[in-house]
């Protein structure tokens, strides 16, 4: 019988080249910067860019909106829904 040395999977991963398959550039917040649009509940065209086709608010990890601006955006969308400018659900 021959002795085999067993390498744990984590060590094997680093030994076999643990390069990342691709580099994804971090997106910047669309509401930061000098020419950034203001978040306003009356701007339905801007708010609808951050809604899914079902009418749900798209999470910030997909839209790259900062946490502070995501809260403002959610509040503006909810206010626009209440004022009947945006639908709650899309049928």
Swiss-Prot record:
What does UniProt give as GO cellular component? cytosolic small ribosomal subunit
Keywords, ordered alphabetically: Ribonucleoprotein, Ribosomal protein, RNA-binding, rRNA-binding
Question: Which domain of life does the protein's organism represent?
Answer: Bacteria
* KW Ribonucleoprotein (keyword) present: yes
Q: Do the record's keywords include Transit peptide?
A: no
Q: Which range is the signal sequence, renumbered to this chain?
A: none
Q: Name one GO biological process term.
A: translation
SUPFAM superfamilies in the record: Ribosomal protein S18
A GO molecular-function descriptor: small ribosomal subunit rRNA binding
Q: Which Gene3D superfamilies match?
A: Ribosomal protein S18
PANTHER family hit by this protein:
30S RIBOSOMAL PROTEIN S18, SMALL RIBOSOMAL SUBUNIT PROTEIN BS18M
Q: Which family does it belong to?
A: Belongs to the bacterial ribosomal protein bS18 family.
> What is the documented function of this protein?
Binds as a heterodimer with protein bS6 to the central domain of the 16S rRNA, where it helps stabilize the platform of the 30S subunit.
How does it associate, per the subunit comment?
Answer: Part of the 30S ribosomal subunit. Forms a tight heterodimer with protein bS6.
What is the protein named?
Small ribosomal subunit protein bS18
- Could you tell me which species this protein originates from? Gluconacetobacter diazotrophicus (strain ATCC 49037 / DSM 5601 / CCUG 37298 / CIP 103539 / LMG 7603 / PAl5)
């Amino acid at each position: 019988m021959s002795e085999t040395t067993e390498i744990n999977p984590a060590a094997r991963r680093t030994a076999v080249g643990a390069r990342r398959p691709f580099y994804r550039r971090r997106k910047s917040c669309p509401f930061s910067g000098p020419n950034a649009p203001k978040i306003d509940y009356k701007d339905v065209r801007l708010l609808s860019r951050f809604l899914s086709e079902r009418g749900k608010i798209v999470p910030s990890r997909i839209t790259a909106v900062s946490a502070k601006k995501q809260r403002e955006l959610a509040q503006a969308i909810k206010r626009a829904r209440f004022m009947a400018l945006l639908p709650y659900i899309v049928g």
